């Protein structure tokens, strides 16, 4: 017998994920909420330069938004691709007007009137109208915790792709 365990995933959250104007992008409802924020001449801060963050930034630039991308690594797509390929993505975002803040993280996001103030780990801060969290996903494995299956950021598998621990 064969059983496929497709756990799914949810957007990784931060302490400020519930601040109005801060968005995640994982579901159609998330996309619909974010779409209302995509307005020309407004400023979007994108936290994370992986696939979700890079695509959201590109879309925001297309509609005429000012975009700042914040990424703790030295280049976008750093967890999925090498620095050279990430550099190509960075160049394209720069060509289209994005401000890139690499090698720095966000310490805090707080409302300031109708805008959001982002405090960064390098001591700088700036304001944006909306924020997108593109900082990865969390695998939905909680329901497997008492199953005996070995978990480590997902289901641990052996060389034959069989779950370890059962």
Predicted regions mapped to residue ranges:
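Glycine-rich nucleotide phosphate-binding loop and flanking beta-alpha elements
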Residues: 10-12, 53, 76, 126, ...
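Glycine-rich dinucleotide-binding loop and its adjacent helix/turn
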Residues: 5-63
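Short, Asp-centered acidic motifs that coordinate Mg2+ and/or phosphate
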Residues: 2, 99, 130
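Conserved beta-strand-loop-beta-strand element in the redox core of flavoprotein oxidoreductases
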Residues: 1-3, 110-125
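Short, acidic, Ser/Thr-enriched surface-loop or helix-capping motifs
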Residues: 95, 120, 158
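FAD-site-proximal beta/loop scaffold in flavoenzymes
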Residues: 20-41, 125-166
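Rossmann-like dinucleotide-binding cores of NAD(P)H-dependent redox enzymes
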Residues: 43, 51-108
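Conserved SAM/SAH-binding loop
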Residues: 28, 103-107, 121-123
